[in-house]
């Protein structure tokens, strides 16, 4: 049974978060966030299909597929670090290196994400000052999960968080997530960043499979304005601190985890669609007895048009 709980990205054991105003947006709104795990994590990710991919997308794709483990994600809002060329990639490296130093972990264990204005270089002096402050007050509670969720917002009217708990062989396992997205919402996926944390012990390849399998029927099924973003990113970090027997095959326990992760993605997708720029209501269409997935998708596209 999937039980909804509070806590967002801090609901799962061993995860801390923080969000603050570094000054990127030139106002009092929070614009930098950190999600950190006490233990190394298996990581999975899905990314934009736009031909123009922002520097953080390229950076994270490489780390998710090549790093032995991941332990933190640092995010800035206000500037997307998209269409920024080689300088943009250098900024990603600098963010990872400085965040790693501040946390005492390797740069290769730090994922980065950016959202905001396209075509503008990151103000690295401001960002580096924010990076130095983020670990100071990070904590594993609802308040700091909320601060992080607020800090990743751009045109969103409210923050978006979900968390659930399931039972795997008598062991409570938790999954929590936060996301942002309001405009440029169109598969695949939308202008959105999504960060999911779990204390489940699960094989990295199965974690990626569970994420990828659920994305098509959740985030890739929402649309607001038909625009596909340069920065779309969904990341999942699993630190294994629940203490369950590691999930290493597609058995009943994998199915339980998959269903819970799917639920998280589905609920976050609805929050994004409901907060779309110019939207006044959210329609949910249920298609019953569609013979094949193609019919399902065609009906979805028609409903968007």
PLM region spans:
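N-terminal amphipathic/basic leader segments beginning at the initiator methionine
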Residues: 1-47
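Glycine-rich phosphate/pyrophosphate-binding loop regions near the starts of catalytic domains
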Residues: 35-92, 187-207
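Short, well-ordered amphipathic alpha-helical segments that serve as non-catalytic structural scaffolds
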Residues: 53-63, 89-102, 208-221, 260-269
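Short, surface-exposed loop/turn segments at secondary-structure boundaries that line and modulate
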Residues: 73, 78-86, 108-129, 223-246, ...
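Glycine-rich, mobile lid/loop segments that gate access to catalytic sites or pores
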Residues: 102, 107-216
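Flexible, glycine/charged-enriched surface loops at secondary-structure junctions
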Residues: 105-111, 140-149, 162-163, 219-231, ...
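Glycine- and Gly-Pro-enriched alpha-helical subdomains that act as flexible
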Residues: 222-223, 241-249, 253-273
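Conserved small/polar residues in nucleotide/adenosyl-binding loops
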Residues: 295-302
């Amino acid at each position: 049974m999937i039980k909804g709980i509070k806590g967002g990205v801090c609901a799962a054991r061993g995860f801390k978060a923080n969000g603050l105003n570094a000054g990127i947006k030139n106002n009092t709104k929070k614009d930098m966030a950190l999600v950190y795990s006490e233990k190394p994590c298996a990581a999975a990710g899905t990314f934009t299909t736009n031909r123009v991919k922002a520097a953080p997308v390229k950076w994270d794709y490489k780390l998710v597929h090549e790093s032995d483990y991941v332990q933190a994600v640092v995010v800035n809002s206000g500037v997307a670090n998209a269409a920024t060329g080689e300088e943009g990639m250098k900024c990603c490296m600098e963010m990872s290196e400085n965040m790693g130093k501040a946390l005492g972990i390797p740069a290769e264990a730090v994922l980065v994400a950016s959202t905001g204005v396209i075509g503008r270089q990151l103000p690295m002096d401001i960002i580096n000052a924010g990076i130095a402050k983020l670990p100071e007050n990070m904590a594993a509670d609802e308040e700091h999960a909320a601060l992080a969720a607020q800090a990743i917002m751009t045109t969103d009217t409210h923050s978006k968080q979900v968390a659930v708990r399931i039972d795997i062989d008598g062991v409570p396992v938790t999954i929590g997530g936060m996301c942002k997205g309001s405009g440029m919402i169109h598969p695949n996926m939308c202008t959105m960043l999504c960060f999911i944390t779990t204390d489940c012990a699960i094989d990295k390849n199965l974690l990626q499979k569970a994420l990828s399998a659920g994305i098509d029927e959740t985030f890739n099924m929402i649309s607001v304005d038909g625009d596909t973003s340069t920065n779309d990113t969904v990341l999942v970090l699993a630190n294994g601190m629940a203490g369950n027997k590691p999930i290493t095959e597609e058995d009943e326990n994998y199915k339980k985890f998959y269903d819970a992760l799917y639920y998280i993605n589905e609920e976050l997708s609805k929050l994004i669609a409901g907060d779309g720029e110019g939207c006044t209501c959210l329609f949910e269409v249920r298609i019953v007895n569609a013979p094949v997935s193609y019919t399902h998708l065609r009906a979805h596209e028609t409903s968007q048009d």
